[in-house]
A protein has these predicted regions:
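Gram-positive cell-envelope targeting signals
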Residues: 1-28, 32-35, 64, 72-74, ...
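Immediate post-signal peptide segment of exported/extracytoplasmic ligand-binding proteins
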Residues: 24-53, 66, 127-138, 202, ...
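Periplasmic-binding protein-like
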Residues: 39, 115-122, 191, 195, ...
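Acidic, polar ligand-binding/catalytic clefts
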Residues: 58, 62, 66, 71-133, ...
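Extended ligand-binding regions for polar small-molecule ligands
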Residues: 58-67, 128, 132, 137-138, ...
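Ligand-binding clefts/hinges and TM-proximal coupling segments of bilobed small-molecule sensing domains
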Residues: 71, 146-169, 202-208, 235-273
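A ligand-binding cleft/hinge motif common to bilobed small-molecule-binding domains
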Residues: 81-84, 97-106, 150-154, 178-214
Length: 306
């Protein structure tokens, strides 16, 4: 059902492209797509042991560019400077576990493709089991991250106020080093990053608290107003999803349970199906009631005749 709905959306996107008569390139001459990303944000973007930039988002961007015949330029950026990089034209998009929620009006967004949660990671022997247990504790978070935004939101102001301290680190590798050393008691982080970091460390040494800080979704952020590039890239992602390539990549990087492409269409389809079933039930009940009334009327008429 999900892929059928995605196919319908893909057809509509392609039709819009045909109507406009425009083929969009990040760079009309060299046909490049310059993707800005945090180079220390596994499993979405990072440097592997061979010195290559890889990750779910970067590999997906690579496949999109292969389909379009473009060159992908992977550009590591200081996450705190991402808006400057985008608005100055140094990069074409921010594609790296980038949270939509709370930034809806700041970028031209793709559709959401991954569900995400902001969570807390603590040492297993810390005695911290709930968010309430973080009262009086030292918490670290990445600068300019969605986790920081979540902690500063009105929904979590009481939680954040309970901390002994909230310290911003330049990246999550530094944040986890602070947990390792005991300089911090907990790190607020995206669930995908948390799972990756725990998999790289001693088994059972760290745990993710059950209660999330915030639920959200990832999208690709383009410069405000750049709908044509957004639509071109998203159309290719839908094709890759239809071909099973997105799910394959997600499984490779262990984020398959976060995929949400087509979820809105599924919800609409389920709602339509429920409405249709309800209408059928109502029709059946009305038919049955009418039949019963007709039978009763006939019996009454027969009795009167006798």
């Amino acid at each position: 059902m999900k892929k059928k709905m995605v196919a319908a959306v893909l057809t509509a996107v392609m039709a819009l492209g045909m109507v406009s008569g425009v083929t969009v390139y990040a760079d009309a001459d060299s046909k490049t797509l310059v993707v800005g990303f945090d180079a220390e944000y596994p499993p979405f973007g990072y440097m592997n042991d061979e010195g290559e930039y890889v990750g779910f988002d970067l590999d997906l961007a690579e496949k999109v560019c292969e389909n379009l015949g473009w060159e992908l330029v992977k550009t590591p950026i200081n996450w705190d400077s991402k808006d400057t990089e985008l608005n100055s034209g140094n990069i074409d998009c921010i594609w790296n576990g980038f949270t939509i929620n709370g930034r809806e009006d700041d970028y031209t967004w793709s559709e959401a493709y991954l569900n995400n949660e902001q969570v807390m990671v603590v040492k297993a022997d810390s005695g911290i089991e709930t968010l309430e247990d973080l009262a009086g504790k030292n918490v670290v978070v990445q600068t300019a991250s969605a986790a920081l935004d979540a902690l500063n939101s009105d929904d979590n102001k009481d939680l954040t106020a309970s901390f002994a301290s909230l310290t911003e680190n330049p990246d999550y590798n530094t944040a986890f080093m602070n947990i390792d050393s005991g300089a911090a008691d907990a790190v607020a982080v995206d669930i995908g990053v948390a799972k990756y970091q725990l998999a790289q460390r001693e088994e059972g040494k760290y745990v993710i608290l059950d209660e999330p800080i915030q639920s959200e979704q990832y999208g690709i952020g383009f410069k405000k107003g750049n709908e044509e590039l957004r639509d071109t890239v998203w159309a290719e992602i839908l094709k890759l999803y239809e071909a099973g390539e997105v799910e394959k990549l997600a499984e490779e990087y262990e984020v398959a349970d976060m995929l949400c492409i087509g979820d809105d269409e599924d919800a609409d389809a389920d709602a339509a199906e429920t409405t249709e079933e309800a209408a059928e039930d109502t029709t059946e009940e009305t038919t049955e009631d009418t039949a019963e009334e007709t039978t009763e009327d006939a019996e009454a008429a027969e009795a009167d005749a006798e």
